[in-house]
Amino acid sequence: MKRLLCFASLPLLFLTLACTPQPSTVSLSHGLDASAGELDCYIISTETATYYLEKQGGGFSSILDVDGVDWLGFHKKPGSAHKGEYRGFPNSIHNQDGNYFHALNAGTELSTSVVEIETDDHIRIVFTSANKKWEGRWDFHLDRCDFTMTKVSPGYKYWILYEGVPGGEMDADDFWYSSANDQPQPIDQTYTEDLPSPEWIAFGDPDAPRMIYLLHHEDDDQPDGYINRADMTVFGFGRLEKEKYLDTPQTFSIGFVESTEYKKIEHFVEQSLE
């Protein structure tokens, strides 16, 4: 009889354990990004993404979704251009009193970093350029990452770029949404205007159940440009062709939305501003 009771209780015990939700946390570890060329990185794991933040350059080398797909595809190999070394986020300072906040490639100048906050729901890492003129703050939350340019070199400008590969590689049937239009735009469709407030854009792959989004927390009247470079996206807040327009401290978000429906993406992005 005792044996019968024991066996009868096992399914109940298994069900209880299986249905117990696991806590959602933001965790920080350290390691190499092999896909980027063995670069030393902060590795930040959240419930929706894994971010590889390269320690010397101060930019992302990889952003993995929950299926392990990398939506950046950076590699430091010299000469790889759009197929590797140009990719990343935020890639913000280029020939503007230095070249900073880009995963380390042949043209990236070095920065130093410090972890300022490390809790279960918030990690903050601050990078300072070698010339002390630029400072960028990374804040990682359960559902997104915020990048804030907290210090701008006087008289210089920057942009915030997503140069990546939706769904792991660029395909002709990839697409994007934005705050300017609720209809999906083909990946070849360019954009050269100021996005309406709240300024956001999201990129998707028809085979993926999610999209990667970028959000500008402050509204402005500066251009936001997108063009398809065949091997990667080139989207920039404060960018038109090769001109930079941002010159004050501002905040931007990047992350995944587990949907490809416009209204759900719009709602998720707007919640990030609350």
Regions found by a protein language model. Name each.
Residues 86-143, 154-161:
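Extended, loop-rich substrate-binding clefts of extracytoplasmic carbohydrate-active enzymes
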Residues 39-111, 121:
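Acidic-aromatic substrate-binding/catalytic surfaces of carbohydrate-active enzymes
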Residues 1-8:
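Bacterial N-terminal signal peptides that target proteins for export
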Residues 141-181:
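Acidic (Asp/Glu-rich), glycine- and aromatic
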Residues 26-47, 56, 202-274:
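Beta-strand-rich recognition/accessory modules
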Residues 178-212:
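A recognition module on extended beta-rich or small alphabeta surfaces enriched in W/G with H and D/E
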Residues 16-18:
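C-terminal motif of bacterial Sec signal peptides marking the signal peptidase cleavage site
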Residues 20-24:
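Bacterial lipoprotein signal-peptidase II cleavage site
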